[in-house]
Amino acid sequence: LSIKYGLKGPNLATVTACTTGLHSVGLAYRMIQMGDAEAMLAGGSEATVSPLGIGGFAAARALSTRDCAPSEASRPFDKRRDGFVLGEGAGVLLLESYESAKRRGANIYAEIVGFGMSGDAYHMTSPDKIGTSRCMQNALSNAGLNQEDVCYINAHGTSTQIGDKN
């Protein structure tokens, strides 16, 4: 993308499985915060609908076996959950410093005030709640907030018994 659109400055390709897009946004936020860039594109994509992807998730028993509409099959945190439905997609955000956005008269839709990440070194598909808790504490600390200040959590619900456990 940088070559095609002439984007210059810091760039990297983040590869952290399900957290790739979020890590890309968080790292871009930090680079802007540190003054390494005024604006950055950040996002992720997923393209696992392939023989390898389907075979791997089927072998791990992570795919839903329900015979219903895909929108009804994947049920994160539901007692009757039995796996997810594969899909593909991509998303990219333009992040920039507040000063840069104001200078160009941008419509500001949101502000990132903190970011945290943590590896739990536990299991590839069964996250450990200690690592998850540490990640949230890191984000709160970075934002200068307390847990009482949080009104929304975007959970990683895989609709699998093991993935939704913690």
Predicted feature descriptions by range:
Residues L1-L27, A59-V85:
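Conserved catalytic cysteine-centered active-site region
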Residues C68-L145, C151-Y152:
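Condensing-enzyme catalytic core mediating Claisen C-C bond formation in acyl metabolism
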Residues N11-T16, A37-S45, N107-F115, E148-A155:
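Beta-strand segments within the central parallel beta-sheet cores of soluble alpha/beta enzyme folds
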Residues E38-D82, F115-P127, G157-D164:
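Acyl-CoA/ACP chain-elongation machinery
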Residues L7, A17-T20, S45-T48, E99-S100, ...:
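Short acidic/polar capping segments at secondary-structure boundaries
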Residues Y29-Q33, L41:
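Non-catalytic positions within long, well-ordered alpha-helices that form the structural scaffold/packing
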Residues G6, Q33, S141-G144:
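Residue-level signal for alpha-helix termini/capping positions
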